[in-house]
Curated annotation (Swiss-Prot):
GO molecular function list: proton-transporting ATP synthase activity, rotational mechanism
Family matches, as PANTHER family: ATP SYNTHASE DELTA CHAIN (PTHR11910)
The protein's name: ATP synthase subunit delta
Record family assignment: Belongs to the ATPase delta chain family.
Purpose: F(1)F(0) ATP synthase produces ATP from ADP in the presence of a proton or sodium gradient. F-type ATPases consist of two structural domains, F(1) containing the extramembraneous catalytic core and F(0) containing the membrane proton channel, linked together by a central stalk and a peripheral stalk. During catalysis, ATP synthesis in the catalytic domain of F(1) is coupled via a rotary mechanism of the central stalk subunits to proton translocation.
Subunit field text: F-type ATPases have 2 components, F(1) - the catalytic core - and F(0) - the membrane proton channel. F(1) has five subunits: alpha(3), beta(3), gamma(1), delta(1), epsilon(1). F(0) has three main subunits: a(1), b(2) and c(10-14). The alpha and beta chains form an alternating ring which encloses part of the gamma chain. F(1) is attached to F(0) by a central stalk formed by the gamma and epsilon chains, while a peripheral stalk is formed by the delta and b chains.
Membrane topology term: Peripheral membrane protein
Gene label: atpH
Location (main, coarse): membrane
Organism: Bifidobacterium adolescentis (strain ATCC 15703 / DSM 20083 / NCTC 11814 / E194a)
Amino acid sequence: MRGEASRIADRVSRDSLAPKLRDSGEDAWRIGNELFTITNVLDHNIQLERALTDPSRPVEDKVAVVKTLIGDEAHPLTMEIMSDLVARRWSRVSDIANAAEDFGVDGMMYYADHTNATLQVSIELAQLHSALLNLPVVRSKLYDATVPAEARIKLLYSLIGNADFNVVTKRLAEHATCNLRNRRYLQTIQWLINKFSRHMGESMVTVTTATPLSKEQVKKLVAIYSAKTGHPVHINSVVDPTVLGGMRIQVGDEVTDNTVVAQLQHLQRTVKATA
């Protein structure tokens, strides 16, 4: 959890620079990638984080360090964002990397907006999340810090390589395993889904069933969860025959599993406990 100083710094910086990032169009892709790279560098260099967040150090010195870090080939807006971040006060040194990552995700969202792919990316992230729920061994390897990042990325693309995912979806999925940031893989994907949902002004409701939902079921679910959340929702329907029947519904981090397979598993646990 970020301290008050960091929350203020992050909010003010993003409020100030979000319009420029939003208006950067196709360049938002490049900026987002550069900020992800910077996040990774900061995460692996505590001395650099300290140098960039030291309140006793002149801002000009910290900006000079940033210029040395990113070089002359970085996008001007990347430099402007980082210069703004180092000029602010942070509760913890690691919070500047969090802010850089937030800007990186914003860049990817604005690029998705620019290419009319925002909803598509949100749905694909939810599909990836749902698929990994049934692959515990794979997802554990995707956030295994003892496995080299290159190997984790290779594993990811062996999973999604044949999927017709948007380039933004693939980049975000790659970022989540390339730079773990002390998070479980599904935790990061859910965080990204939530950010896209807030960005679009609607919630993503992932419904897993053994057979496709009917139009009437989708309409009913939209009405129920729109009323529950207080804003529009999108139903992401996932068909998984292994659940046998019933529904598993996920909204953000909240999961309601009333599938037949879940009930059978619960029954098995109950029988074992009383045996």
